[in-house]
Amino acid sequence: MLTYPNINPIAFSLGPLKVHWYGLMYLIGFVSAWLLGYWRIKHYKLNWNNDQLSDLIFYSALGVILGGRVGYMLFYDFQEFIHHPWVLFKIWEGGMSFHGGLLGVVIAAWLFCRKYGKTFLEVGDFVAPLVPLGLAAGRLGNFINGELWGRITDVPWGMIYPHVDDQPRHPSQLYEFGLEGVALFILIWCYASKPRQQGRVSALFLMGYAICRLIAESFRQPDSQLGFVAFGWLTMGQVLSIPMLLIGIWLWWAKR
């Protein structure tokens, strides 16, 4: 069995300012998205320019942070939000929802489309290959924070989280790093390397993420304040992923 390493969540301090690893992971995600977008524009000679790319990353960053935090409080910790609304601003403590962030990015993309006259699916197809590496960085942030641990297991790589209990658990943050991050990146990046019908890349991302999340959540300990939210075995993350999967299937079929 493995033991979770005692990692200081603070990467470094600049005077009174403490820079957390979790925040750095988000910065890495946004920077990697810009670099990948820049490479795709140049390599594939896409009808995008650097100003549009920078604006898109900026809009998306706001959508991810605001939507992710609000989504977490609404989907996962609503009672805490009602009684202590100021916790909404404690982003460095963790507590971000991918599905909330996705909704935030949808709104940001809509505003971006209005500004630049691009279609929503064109923007979605451009953004989709840029996202998984950011998801991978976010899951590493979860691991460093020692949060979102897995269910009790007897597999040889089970990890004991001393701050939780003395039972070996699935390192589910690393599973999600591998599935939602690395595997999904390879899938989407390779698929988007050739011209595709508009909407197909977006559809593949929606389906791919939903499937990865549905699998990974089966190893993850449900949030203590929620438990299983449907049928006695579905977690909130799985419930929120099902509409993604259905929309992805519908979009894939519609764009065949």
From Swiss-Prot:
Q: Which amino acids does the record list as binding a 1,2-diacyl-sn-glycero-3-phospho-(1'-sn-glycerol)?
A: R139
Gene Ontology terms: biological process: lipoprotein biosynthetic process
PANTHER family under this entry?
Answer: PHOSPHATIDYLGLYCEROL--PROLIPOPROTEIN DIACYLGLYCERYL TRANSFERASE (PTHR30589:SF0), PROLIPOPROTEIN DIACYLGLYCERYL TRANSFERASE (PTHR30589)
Keyword annotations for this protein, in alphabetical order, are: Cell inner membrane, Cell membrane, Membrane, Transferase, Transmembrane, Transmembrane helix
Primary location group: membrane
Q: How does it sit in the membrane?
A: Multi-pass membrane protein
Q: Which HAMAP family match?
A: Lgt
Report which residue ranges the record marks as coiled coil. Answer: none
Originating species:
Legionella pneumophila (strain Lens)
The protein here is known as Phosphatidylglycerol--prolipoprotein diacylglyceryl transferase
User: What EC number(s) would the UniProt record show?
Assistant: 2.5.1.145
| Bilayer-crossing regions | 19-39, 56-76, 91-111, 231-251
**What role does it play?**
Catalyzes the transfer of the diacylglyceryl group from phosphatidylglycerol to the sulfhydryl group of the N-terminal cysteine of a prolipoprotein, the first step in the formation of mature lipoproteins.
User: Per its record, what are the GO molecular function terms?
Assistant: phosphatidylglycerol-prolipoprotein diacylglyceryl transferase activity
Give the similarity note. Belongs to the Lgt family.
Record's InterPro entries? Answer: Lgt
Which PROSITE patterns does the record match to this protein?
LGT (PS01311)
Name the top EC class.
transferase
What Gene Ontology cellular-component terms does the record carry? plasma membrane
UniProt KW Cell cycle keyword: no
* One Pfam assignment: LGT
Localization per Swiss-Prot or TrEMBL: Cell inner membrane
Pathway(s) annotated for this protein in UniProt: Protein modification; lipoprotein biosynthesis (diacylglyceryl transfer)
